[in-house]
């Protein structure tokens, strides 16, 4: 059998086939190429980059790749040249068998555009296969009495090539008895038959050897041969006969294995062994013998395995009936396989985007997929669908490819991920369907600012809070995810009371907890207005603000402060006066107190905590007024000591106490006589302070005395010189020496400083007052100096006292008290100028000293008798009324339960000046002395 080389003739056909490979139609979305089979791996098929409108280097950048369904990749892309090349040798006969047109379809995917192009490559057949008989030798039997024209069926040859390269003709070697006739069957196959031309004579020649040659139409021509041995038999008059000679049957592809398809019947009129027929497949192919079974006695054809329409749509076979005399008859059988909807549609995902940003535009491609159904006709028609309530749709692409695209904007906060159910269904009966799930995550975009649950917040913190204590917590929610939802908190920059807001409070940037950076004082700070900003960590970040009102709650941290009577600072005791003639309810004094707190913590109540004479005095609960509870009796002591407690209404309540000393007397001498017995407890620390003050005053006094002595000496020397000059010059009579130094010079010095001895309840302890401006020009006169000069004539005090006892001068009318200055119930009693007031020189001088001390105290705001400025240490009724000029104004915090009165600041009572009438009287006294 001839077997020419496979590559023979291929080189001559390569050039025209390469030219065919450049044919394409890029404008239609379907690219077509042609190429010959059996090219080497990497052979050029077409310039795919050019046909796609791309540069070669863009193939990799754009993700261009080949996609095909369930088939070994026959082609590849050359990224350097942009060409479509073969991935290996392509055998057309293996790929397409006897199909006259061999076309390979696949798709080119441009990944970044989610666009797909169809590519069709036609494989051109070359003459690389020679005709081939199944058997190299065939034995044929024929009766010797066979008539001329008897036909014997010969085996036919097969050529895997198609077209002009397929089988064209047969040739029979030359002989005397037989000729060759070629019959074309209904399937287009050429069947050779041996025709008897001359009668046979078994006795002359028993065996005839012939050579049958099959030729194709290629160039060069390829051929195949088989050897035929014809054996001459004795006579068999009748040959078998099929009626009809061709059989056809259609069966569904899903018939069970072993199903009988049809029964062939042949007849032979001979008898005996010559009439017994046996059936067999002629030229039995392996595929036929594996699929079908032929009963050799009955001629019944049945299935050996399942039929598959998608694998083979029909089967062509030839059945031979042979009798015992070697006569045969043949019949052709065509089994057509009918398609059954037994294949569910198939979904093949070609490209998929697993995550999509929520700000993508409508029409964005999510996935590219293809569908396939192995059935045909309506059974192979496919419909695709997805749920209607999703923001997606399907768009048909080339062939059976579809795009899954968005139809509207996506919102991750509404739906963060989708599981898209893709349903493909064929049109068969019953229809078959397949579901495929396409997952899609929606990537977050920072499109939502943090959101506070409330438009504003308010909270409170008690004053005196510890530093670093947690005040409040705010929380904002961001519906985004990841960094876009990570919220940080901050406070808006601001200043309060000259200090940055960040020095008052801070906020934890992660938790939103506010902390106090200082201890708040309600009396200084009552509320703070803050703006809290919540910002996410997106790009760009989004933020929102909320207002926070922080209120400081008052705590009862301030004890009541007693304004009147003022607490003494020098150990002296203030004295209030109550006449023995006072009736019950007589107003002795009023305790005035304030509390820096507010509200209930500032409500004050007064009570008498302790009294030397219980039941004699009562204190108003809400007013603080000290009044007599009963009439004063003679047996009541001159000095009454009251301890008044002032208490607020806080929790727990705080209180303060003050000791009020009340002098019970109708006359000043009675008061003065007992002043020495009024003492106040002295703190040891006050004694130390007093000692230091005494030492300091003593030192200053020594310096002052030295200066005065030097001044007096100078004055005496000047005066002595002037007297000598007068004696020598004018010889005038001498003037007697005065007992005093010149008062004019001393008074000039006293205009600057003076030392005073204060008569207080503790006068026996020699309290001294610091140097202060002198009021000698208004309180002293030359006459008073002649009467008593304690600074110059201290050694003559006792003599002067004794002289005054003997020679009592008439009282000085300049020191007589006016009606407004006399004791009484705050000027409520009338009387004349000559009352029970000082009627001797001793009383007058005592009152002068007291007035001098009071005037000095009024100048510096001190009080030696505890009565306050300008009170002479007696009572507010005997001097200027109590003023609040040196006290902080807390009147807005004072609430007096049970009374509508509020504290006022009367300008007329704050100047602390003595009555004008007193000063005028002193000036008149000076004029009299000058006269």
UniProtKB/Swiss-Prot annotation:
Glycans are attached at residues 419, 545. InterPro entries: Cadherin-like_dom, Cadherin-like_sf, Cadherin_C, Cadherin_CBD, Cadherin_CS, Cadherin_N, Protocadherin/Cadherin-CA. One of its GO terms (biological process) is homophilic cell adhesion via plasma membrane adhesion molecules. Residues 921-931 have a biased composition (Basic residues). Pfam families: Cadherin, Cadherin_2, Cadherin_C_2, Cadherin_tail. It is found in: Cell membrane. Residues 809-840 have a biased composition (Polar residues). SUPFAM superfamilies: Cadherin-like. It comes from the Eukaryota. GO terms for cellular component: plasma membrane. The keyword Transmembrane helix applies. Residues 714-931 are cytoplasmic. The chain crosses the membrane at residues 693-713. Gene3D superfamilies: Cadherins. This is Protocadherin gamma-A5. The gene is PCDHGA5.
